[in-house]
Structures are given as C-alpha cells and as structure tokens.
C-alpha cells in the first residue's frame, strides 16, 4: 500500500470507532517466509492462480496473533464469512499459537451478506466509494483478488472497471529481470531488495493491465469457488524464473520440483503453513536454486507479455556439446545407434512377451 492508502485506511478505522489503530509492516517477512518459495516453486494453483491472497493470510495471522500477545489482548477478531477459506487460515493459527485468546467473528456469526454490510455502513454515516464496495478486493505484494456477483456465477466475466489497474500504456516495452539464486534482485539493471523489485515490476507491468484472470478451485470446505485477480508482477516473475530454470536445471530436478512445489502451494492454500512438512519443502526448494542465476528478457504489451529469452553463465543449452535437431560433436553415428538399441530393450521385451 502507498502512504496515502495507509493514511486513508487509518482515517476510515477511526471514523468507524476504533480506539487505537496499528499498522504492521510485514512485507519483508512475507517475502522471506512465503513469496520467495512460491517463486522458487513456480507455484500457480491449477496452473492459473499465484496464490495472491491465500499466500499472505498465514503471515497476516502470525503477525496479528504476535501483536495480540504483545498487548495482552483477551480477544482477536477477523472479518471472514463462514463460507470461505480465510476463516480456516486465521482460526487455525490463532487457535494453535494462542488458544487462550478468544476469536470474534461477527460476519460469520451473524451470517451477514456484503449488501447488509454496505447498508450498515451507510446507515452509520461511513463514506466509501460504493460502486467499488460491491467488490471484495484484497490487495497485496503478490497480487490483488477481486470477488463480486459475477464470480458467484460460472459464466459471467468481471467488468473492466472491476480491476484496480487500468490500461495506461500501449507501446511495447522490454524489461530485463535479473535473478540471483532464484531471487529477483534487479529490474532493468537497478538492484534492490527482492520485494522492492517485485513492487517495481508490478508498477511497470500494471500499466499494461497484465496478469488478469479468473481462478476456479476447490475450497478447504469442499465447495467450488471462483475469484478474479490481477497479478502482473507475480505472473511475470514466475514465468521468467521458470524459463531460467529450464535452461539451468536438469530434467529430473525440474520434474521432482514440479510435484513438490504443487504440494507446497496446496498446503499453503489450505492453511497448513505451520505444518513441519512445509519446512521440508522449503529446504528442497532453496537447495534447487543454487545455480539459478541470470538475466531474463520480457516484453510488456497491452493485456499480455512475452518471455523473450535468457542469458546465464549456468545455461546448460551448450552449443559446443550439441545442437538439438541439428548436429552433435560428442558422439558418432554408430554410438548413437548403439545407445538407442540398448535404450529400447525394455520396450522390446514387453512387446515380445505381452503379445
């Protein structure tokens, strides 16, 4: 959030009657504990969603309960409904780390709809942009989710105006992303902390309205859900990082990483951040990144992007070793024939035996 947005949130909080307001900056912690591993794993839920909101809920819960214990609070509250995933993510961590603190959930307990919430705020003189209030918008480092009446259906798209970032630029622009051991450390040769680079990339790419989609998935409670999102930096970073990995990692590293990364993303999505197996996944993912360094070139265009290519000292696509589909320099034709003959043995045996 910008300083202006944070000030506006604080103003609204006092307008609604809070006694004290506290803003907790946990962006660096969020990156180090979660986002970094989502990048290492190229995590996209159902090959679509970069876990923009579900990824941050665990860190929010951890930071909230830490603050609640610091001030010796007897109660902690959250605004989740009784129909979604967030109630599980918050309650699970609150119950686990502070069972003595009572959880208050007014929206869940009173079965309040979004429209009822809006009417309550209007009746109490709270001023908001009500055209926007009809959408549930969750903004964070790794993207923004958008939910509304359209996403409660299986066929309606979100209208253009529902997306926070609108198309501002139409001229194509190429950017250079620099990775060091799997982490994004520079955008257009300007080095910075990884989470700052993500923010910088998002600022550039959001002007092209990149990263929009609608995710359909299974909730923790067992029902299908649909949510819109925009995540320019997340989608670009994941795709750029994945291409760099394709050039650097072995085929077995890539294959084993893929299914372990999916499990990591699934556990995180379902509120299981505190499960010890997550630390095991993270250790594997971190180990896989020791050679993943280099530059990736990305072209930004209206509503989409293209990954152009990579430059890395660790690139295994070595033309001195051989050129795919063209020529080789390390083996003879007879050696190739002998390899294929031996390689085919198990298939030949099956075909000869199972007639």
Where do the model's predicted regions map?
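Nucleotide-activated chemistry modules centered on ATP-dependent adenylation/adenylyltransferase
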Residues: 1-355
């Amino acid at each position: 959030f910008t300083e202006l947005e944070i000030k506006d949130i604080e103003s609204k909080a006092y307008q609604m009657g809070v006694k004290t307001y506290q803003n907790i900056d946990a962006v660096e912690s969020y990156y180090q504990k979660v986002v970094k591993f989502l990048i290492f794993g190229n995590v996209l839920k159902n090959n679509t969603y970069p876990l923009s909101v579900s990824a941050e809920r665990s860190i929010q819960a951890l930071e909230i309960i830490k603050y609640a214990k610091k001030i010796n609070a007897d109660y902690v509250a959250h605004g989740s409904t009784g129909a979604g995933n967030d109630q599980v993510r918050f309650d699970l961590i609150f119950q686990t780390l502070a069972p003595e603190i009572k959880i208050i959930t007014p929206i869940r307990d009173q079965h309040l709809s979004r429209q009822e919430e809006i009417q309550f705020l209007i009746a109490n003189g709270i001023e908001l942009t009500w055209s926007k209030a009809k959408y549930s918008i969750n903004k964070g480092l790794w993207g923004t989710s958008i939910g509304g009446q359209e996403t409660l259906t299986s066929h309606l798209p979100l209208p253009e105006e529902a997306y926070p970032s609108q198309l501002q630029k139409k001229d194509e622009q190429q950017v250079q992303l620099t990775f060091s051991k799997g982490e994004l450390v520079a955008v257009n040769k300007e080095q910075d902390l990884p989470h700052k680079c993500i923010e910088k990339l998002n600022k550039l790419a959001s002007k092209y309205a990149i990263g929009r989609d609608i995710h359909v998935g299974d909730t923790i409670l067992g029902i299908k859900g649909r949510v819109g999102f925009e995540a320019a930096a997340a989608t670009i970073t994941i795709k750029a990082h994945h291409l760099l990995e394709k050039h650097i990692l072995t085929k077995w590293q890539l294959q084993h990483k893929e299914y372990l990364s999916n499990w990591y993303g699934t556990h995180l999505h379902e509120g299981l951040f505190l499960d010890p197996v997550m630390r095991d996944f993270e250790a594997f993912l971190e180990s896989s990144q020791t050679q993943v360094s280099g530059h990736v070139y990305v072209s930004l265009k209206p509503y989409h992007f293209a990954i152009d290519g990579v430059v890395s000292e660790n690139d295994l696509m070595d033309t001195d070793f051989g050129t795919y589909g063209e020529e080789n320099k390390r083996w003879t034709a007879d050696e190739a024939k002998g390899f294929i003959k031996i390689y085919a043995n198990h298939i030949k045996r099956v075909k000869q035996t199972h007639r």
